[in-house]
Structure formats: C-alpha cells, structure tokens
C-alpha cells in the first residue's frame, strides 16, 4: 500500500486501491498538534483506553465493563508493545475478556488479533466483526451485547469502510465511533455520500460523548459530527464553484485539484487531495450536480446543476 513517507500508520493510512481519500488539512495541520495521551488511561468507571503504539498516537483499544470479565474494542496494528501493555493492564486489574469487537477490517484495527490469541487462546471463538471472516463471529446493526456494567449496542456505519461498526455504551450515552469520527482531525472515506449518511445516522442516536479509534475523547459528539458534515458540504460547494469558474472547458480531476488545492505539496496532492476531489465529483454526479464526458480515455467533468 503506497503512502506518503511522513504519514505512515495510525489514522493517516491511505489505501489507493479502495480510493480511501483524505483532505489536505487532514494530512498537514491536523498531524502537528496531537495531544499527549498516556499508554493506559481510565476514562470513565466503565472504559479504559490502551494505546496501540503505532504512529500518530496509534489506534485506541478500549476495555469496557466494570466486572472481572469485560470486552475490548479494536486490537491495534500488531505492535508487540501493545500486546505487552494490554496483558499487563488486564493482569493488574484481574480482568478477563469475553468478547473482542473489531470496528472494521483495516490493519491498524485488526493487526493485534494474532498476539491476542497467542496470549488468550480461549478467545478464538470470541472475535466479532461485521462481514466476518471464516474464523470470526458476525456483528449486525442493532445487536446488543452485555458484560457487567456495560450494555453495548452495535450501529452499522459504512462510508469509511463497508463493514464499519460503531458501538453505543448505553450506560454513558456514549459511542465508540471507530474511524468514522476521530478525536482529532478528519477521517478518510471510501464513499463520501454513504459516509455523510452515516454521520447523520450516528447523530440521530443523540450520544453525548465519543470514544474514537484515534485521538482523545470527544466531549461533545453532536457538535463534532455537525462540524464534519458542514466541512464535507463546504468541500462540495468549493468543487462546484471551481467547476463553474473553469467551465468554459470541461476538466479532468487533476485540473480541478490544481485550482482547488493551490499550494499543496505535489506528493500529498497526488496521494490524498486528488483522490478526495475525485470522490467528491463522484458523489456530485450521483446527486445530478455534475457530469463527465470521456476524451482520450480521461474523464472531463463539468457542472450541470444550480449552485
């Protein structure tokens, strides 16, 4: 998987094959001011966070519940230190695990499963994921799981990935948002239109707090989701305005990017901004606001809707 040299691991991964795209501000300013997070932190009476030890503060693993048997959400990227820290944390608190939830298939969330099974072979039948593999258990939208002190309700939220699941912690009116809503910065997406619908769906649950897969606790989840939606709609408007400005001749994606992303590093432009603009254009085409024609094997876009 090709990536910009200075944006490896954690929630900066870009999978070009799946057209997971990112924003220029996501890849620059947002990476410069990450907060200091402890390797292990008790966030609430029911939630302990363990950092995945991968880049950019890594992927959060959450230990959920209050009793001797609890569940965890996500397993990091497979960094050996993560397994050591998790094992020590569980032993110090005399905790065993009953369920392992994977928010989605990306490697920085599933990579620790082999280490987890090496440490706890009894969990072999307790790995849960939407669209599961042959050795995993299914998670369905609305499915409820319980451990002492915690009732977890699964919410299917595709867009970042087709199998993405979020989890509501009923006792706290909180949501484990996975990669759909990050503690810091903006998520990358596979399908922008689907992702925006997912954000609206998540917002409809009216959870107050978010526990993201990357970054610190989101203390005002409705405001964060509203900001994400506003940003996506603002980007759409910018692309439409750009097309309108240059519409005397239909343009390919790269030319729209050159106008829209002036001043962006060329590698970031190619790896992040251009795929993102292409995703915006595809969504706008589905909405009937833009269209394209093929010239010399290249899509050339033009606006057809009213701004």
Curated annotation (Swiss-Prot):
What Pfam families does the annotation carry? Answer: Lactamase_B
So which cofactors does this thing need? Zn(2+)
Active-site residues? 108 (proton donor/acceptor)
Annotated Zn(2+) 2 binding sites: 108-109
Q: Which InterPro entries match?
A: LACTB2-like_MBL-fold, Metallo-B-lactamas, RibonucZ/Hydroxyglut_hydro, Sec-metab_biosynth-thioest, WH-like_DNA-bd_sf
User: Does the entry feature the keyword Oxidoreductase, yes or no?
Assistant: no
**GO BP, one example?**
monodictyphenone biosynthetic process
Q: Name one GO molecular function term.
A: metal ion binding
The reactions it catalyses are:
atrochrysone carboxyl-[ACP] + H2O = atrochrysone carboxylate + holo-[ACP] + H(+)
Q: How is the cofactor bound?
A: Binds 2 Zn(2+) ions per subunit.
Broad EC category: hydrolase
EC numbers listed for it are 3.1.2.-
**Which residues bind Zn(2+) 1 per the record?**
104, 106
UniProt superkingdom? Eukaryota
Q: Which UniProt keywords apply?
A: Hydrolase, Metal-binding, Zinc
Keyword Metal-binding on entry: yes
Q: Annotated pathway, please?
A: Secondary metabolite biosynthesis
- Known SUPFAM superfamilies for this protein? Metallo-hydrolase/oxidoreductase
Knocked-out gene: effects: Impairs the production of monodictyphenone and any of the intermediates of the pathway.
Q: What does this protein do?
A: Atrochrysone carboxyl ACP thioesterase; part of the gene cluster that mediates the biosynthesis of monodictyphenone, a prenyl xanthone derivative. The pathway begins with the synthesis of atrochrysone thioester by the polyketide synthase (PKS) mdpG. The atrochrysone carboxyl ACP thioesterase mdpF then breaks the thioester bond and releases the atrochrysone carboxylic acid from mdpG. The atrochrysone carboxylic acid is then converted to atrochrysone which is further transformed into emodin anthrone.
**Listed PANTHER family:** ATROCHRYSONE CARBOXYL ACP THIOESTERASE, ENDORIBONUCLEASE LACTB2
Q: Which family does it belong to?
A: Belongs to the metallo-beta-lactamase superfamily.
- The molecule here is called Atrochrysone carboxyl ACP thioesterase
According to its UniProt entry, this protein's organism is Emericella nidulans (strain FGSC A4 / ATCC 38163 / CBS 112.46 / NRRL 194 / M139) (Aspergillus nidulans)
């Amino acid at each position: 998987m090709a990536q910009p040299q200075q944006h490896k691991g954690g929630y900066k991964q870009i999978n070009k094959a799946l057209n997971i795209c990112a924003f220029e501000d996501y890849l620059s300013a947002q990476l410069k001011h990450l907060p200091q997070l402890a390797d292990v932190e008790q966030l609430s009476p029911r939630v302990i966070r363990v950092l995945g030890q991968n880049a950019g503060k890594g992927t959060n693993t959450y230990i959920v519940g209050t009793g001797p048997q609890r569940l965890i959400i996500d397993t990091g990227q497979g960094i050996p230190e993560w397994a050591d820290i998790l094992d020590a944390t569980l032993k110090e608190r005399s905790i065993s695990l009953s369920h392992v939830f994977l928010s989605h298939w990306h490697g920085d969330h599933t990579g620790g499963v082999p280490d987890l099974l090496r440490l706890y072979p009894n969990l072999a039948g307790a790995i849960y994921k939407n669209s599961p593999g042959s050795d995993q258990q299914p998670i369905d939208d609305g499915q409820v799981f319980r451990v002492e002190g915690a009732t977890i309700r699964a919410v299917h939220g595709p867009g970042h990935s087709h199998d993405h699941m979020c989890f509501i912690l009923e006792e706290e009116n909180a949501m484990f948002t996975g990669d759909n809503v990050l503690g810091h910065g903006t998520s990358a997406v596979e399908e922008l239109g689907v992702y925006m619908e997912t954000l609206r769906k998540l917002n409809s649950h009216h959870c107050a707090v978010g526990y993201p897969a990357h970054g610190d606790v989101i203390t005002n989840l409705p405001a964060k989701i509203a900001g994400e939606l506003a940003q996506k709609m603002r980007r759409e408007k910018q692309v439409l305005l750009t097309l309108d400005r240059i519409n005397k001749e239909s343009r390919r994606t790269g030319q729209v990017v050159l106008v829209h992303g002036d001043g962006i590093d060329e590698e970031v432009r190619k790896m992040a901004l251009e795929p993102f603009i292409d995703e915006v254009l595809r969504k706008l085409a589905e909405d009937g606001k833009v269209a394209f024609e093929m010239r010399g094997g290249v899509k050339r876009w033009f606006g057809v809707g009213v701004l």
